[in-house]
Structure formats: C-alpha cells, structure tokens
C-alpha cells in the first residue's frame, strides 16, 4: 500500500491523498465520535494583496525556477525549519504554479505541518499558506528498524480505542522502503493491508508528539489514526479520507420536477465505477463539485476557457444543500442548486454506464484511469446555466485523453424560465453523445457520427438511453414518453413524435428518414425503433427498476431494460465509423450473438422490422427502402409479414 501524505491546509479546498476513499461512516453506530478526533491546528494564509504589501517577500531574489523561489520563501518564512518538497506540485490552467512542502523533524515527517506556495505567471510569489511548527524539536528517537511489535501494538490500540471491525490477533509487521514504515500482515476486516508509519504530530498542547500513524481502510471509513508511541492507549487524532456527501436533488429515477420532489440523498456512487468516490481523483480530495469523473460550475458569462476557475459551491462537510423553487424568476439565485443537480446526475450516469461496459479501456470520462487502460485526463466539464444561448444543451466529445464539455442552457419558453439541469433526461441525453462518439470508431476517433444518418442516430441513442432510464415500475409497453416536455413547457416536447409502441401515436418507419435534413427528427425515428426492441426484451425478461443492473454469471443483464441498453452500447463498439440504420441494426444483432449467443434475435429483429428496418431494408443516398420482414427461422420458423407493422405484435415477438 502506498503511504499517504496529508496536506491539510485550511486555505485550500483540496487534500492531497493517494488511493481511494469509500463512503458512509459506520463508526458512529459503534459509539465512536470521529469528530472528537479531528485535527486542531489550522493553517495561516497570506493572500495576494498581503503578499504585494510585504516588502520582505518582494525582496526575494529572482531565481531560475518557480520551485527555487517557492523554496526560498519557505526558508525565509520559517528560517530554522527542515522540510521536503512533496511530489504533487503542478501548474493550473490559470498559469499559477502550486508547490507543496512537508516539514520534517529528526528525519521524520511532521504530519500536520505543511507549506503551500503559489507562484504567479510573472514568476513572483502569488500567495502562500502554512501550518509549520515553530516550537522546540525533541531529541531524535532511535530510527533503527524495529522488530515489528510496536507497529502491530499501535494497530491493536487503534482497533480498541476506535472500535474498528478489524482482527489483528495474529498480525505481523514487515518493514517497507520508506523511513520507519511497516506493512501489517495477517489481519482481517480491512480492504487492504494496514500500514503503520512513525511520524510527529502537533498535540493539543502545541508540542510535538511522536506517533504511529496507522492507516486502515475498513470500506466504510479509510482512517489515519495517530497512536502515541509512549502511551499506546492514547489516540491523538484521526483523519478519515471518507466522507458522506449529501446532495439536495431530484433523485435518480425522477426525470423532471413533475415526477417528484427534491430530496437530500447521501452519496450514491458505485465503488467499482468510481473507485475514488465522486469528490476525489486519486490525488486530491475536493470539497466542491469536482472529482475524477467531472467538474460542475456555472458559466453565466459564456467563458470558453478557464473552467477550473468558474464559480462552484464549496462545502467542508460535502453537504451540497441549496435552495431552489420552481417559482424563482432569477436563475442566478439558484445556481448552486443547478450545479449540484448536474454534478449528481452526471456522476450517477457515469457509474451506470461503467457497469454496462463504458469503462476506461472503452474511453470513458475520467481524469485518473488508475491503471485500468485508456488515456485518462478527460473528465467532463459540466457547465450549468451556460450563457451562450437559450433553449439548448450540447456535449463536445474530443478523442480519449482530452476533457469533454457539457453545456446546459436556460430555457425561456416558460415563465419563469427553466433550467435544463433539472431535467435528468436532458443531462443523460447529452452525456450519451459522449458514449456514442467514444465507442463508434474507437475512443481515439470522435468523428465517426458525422454523416447525417449517423449523426441522427447519435441523437436517437441519446433519447433512447434517457427514456429507458426514466421508466417507472408500473410502466408497460402501452406507456408513451415525451422528450423534453418539462423543459419546453409543451406536452409534445421537443420531438416530432412521442416514444410509443403504438403506431397510431408514433407511425414512423425507416423511409421517413428520407424527408429530413436535420439530425434530431432522424434520431426520433432511430430511438423509436430501439424503444420497440426495449419493450420486446422487457416483455421477455421483465424490468429491473433499480439504479444498476444485475448480471448472470456470463455477464448478461438479467432483465430486459438493461439488456436492451447493454446491446445498444455493445453495438456502438462493433459498428463501423459513420454507420447507417442498417449497419447499426446489424451491430446490435451481432452484439446479442456475442453476449447471449443470439438468444434474443426474434425480439430484436421484430422490433426493427415493425418500423421498416427488417431483413430487406436498404440504405441508399437516393432513397431508403422499407422492409417489415423478419428473417425466416428467427421467430418460430416463420416471418413477420409487412402487414403486421400496423397491428400489435404478439408478446412472443
């Protein structure tokens, strides 16, 4: 296990960590109040105005590198301190370079003593903060490698004092390469091996205490417990990398405000998909709407760059609870609520798509791929209330390795105006553009839905996934859905036809594509076909109304809804660059063959054939040809006649 280096500067909204936190504390249920073990010593911060006014800082000699300037500032500020440069220094998009230093004493880290220096574009000190210790340093302890009994005893003390669900009766300690650091073996109840490291800590009296920093990941909490070396029964402090994030949002499954009320929901991430949680990228833990999968903010001024500096809410306890009323007339007043909703919905969808196969290797959107393949460095910039225009939303998908951008606009077709971040279907629609563009033609090629027909199918996949996700437990194939009804203020929504299996409600067939020269009406036809396939599969396998699918031992979703979504997703990865309806249909059929051995060919073919994309359908630039036929032998050794397209199909097809 890699060691952790805390950087608990009160002036910063991030904490440097390595590894992944998990959510939801259980220690309170065991009678342990972790808040009583919080660190007591805050850092100081010198802002840019104070730096400019400080003559001593301005007289620091110009050096060859920003790192040298930062180092000189630390030396000048705390002349007698010993320290080391932490390896996570970087330059922000705004041109400010950030350097982090850890104070040491007698060759050991002082875990609560940090110094951060920010160097501006001009090479001068911009601002800085520090919590360096200024008192007397005790005599050095013996730093010879121990026999392992002390770190094991420290772990047992932490387990006893904090009532941790860990068994360490047979534990042994093995030295690691880092100074006075031990891996503790033969324990149970932890996600990974505990680690003990000898460090100093500033105690409640303001003096240096020599402690064992014991790291234990027990899933519900990821703890650093500082156990006194002399008095093993004393735990000076505890740091918990985990945090229960709370969001006041329309929960997953509520498509828009007409379907339910906002609620306070806690966390909600799926650890295999978001192994660092939603507010951590494996190196930094964020106290704002930022994490490995995305960063959400308002963009009222339509800025085209500098997204990291845009306004977003900050909460030390990750409690994102902001007021919102449907009667509010000024959308600026509920910007934080909009950001929170957008961040929540996008992260939920990221995790769902991961379970269906849109992972790191497939080109999903994450900053840190954590060794799982793909390029990384490409979360999604989530622009709430984007000021470019009204009545729209869009998603820009560059190749794998470059961040995507979602722009959600205010809609002015109602009074008061409406914010599309509060309609989950719109958020999911936009995010699905990232899915279809990354999968079609491979993650490195984002230009594979650039034809009119393939671009239209991109719109269709987005509508389809949004509609499938909003299905309710009581829904049957008789249920019709409108896309964008709430945001537009129109019962007809923003598409030509509702999504329906009733040909009287939605009569569209393949050749109707001929009349359109824009992608959205073409997408309406493609999604209508997928909606037919969806209900054929639901009628066969039932519908899972939970947030995530259940899979059988072969990796096949057990229900029809998630199976339809899985096949659509797998088909994207199989289909060629710039597919047609015909080739995309074939790819979905191939996806079923690959996943299930072709167990659902009748349901899939029947869904497409009902709307003219049967066996003999033809794509041509001069005009498309309908076919309402299912291949012979696919459905009970018979064909579905073209006459069947105007009547309800039997449940068996």
UniProtKB/Swiss-Prot annotation:
Propeptide: 20-244
EC identifiers of the protein: 3.4.24.-
PROSITE patterns for this protein: ZINC_PROTEASE
Residues the entry annotates as binding Zn(2+): 429, 433
Summary of the function given for this chain in its UniProt record: Secreted metalloproteinase that allows assimilation of proteinaceous substrates.
Cofactor names: Zn(2+)
SUPFAM superfamilies documented for this protein: Metalloproteases ('zincins'), catalytic domain (SSF55486)
Stated name of the protein: Extracellular metalloproteinase
GO terms classed as biological process: proteolysis
Subcellular localization: Secreted
Active site: 430
GO molecular function: metalloendopeptidase activity; zinc ion binding
Coiled coil: none
InterPro entries: FTP_domain (IPR011096), Fungal_virulence_M36 (IPR050371), Peptidase_M36 (IPR001842), Peptidase_M4/M1_CTD_sf (IPR027268)
Main EC class the enzyme belongs to: hydrolase
Induction pattern: Expression is controlled by the prtT transcription factor.
GO terms under cellular component: extracellular region
Cofactor note (record): Binds 1 zinc ion per subunit.
Keywords recorded for this protein, A-Z: Glycoprotein, Hydrolase, Metal-binding, Metalloprotease, Protease, Secreted, Signal, Zinc, Zymogen
Signal peptide: 1-19
Family per similarity comment: Belongs to the peptidase M36 family.
Gene3D superfamilies attached to this UniProt entry: 3.10.170.10, Neutral Protease Domain 2 (1.10.390.10)
Keyword Acyltransferase: no
Positions glycosylated per UniProt: 327, 336, 412, 636-637
UniProt gene name: MEP
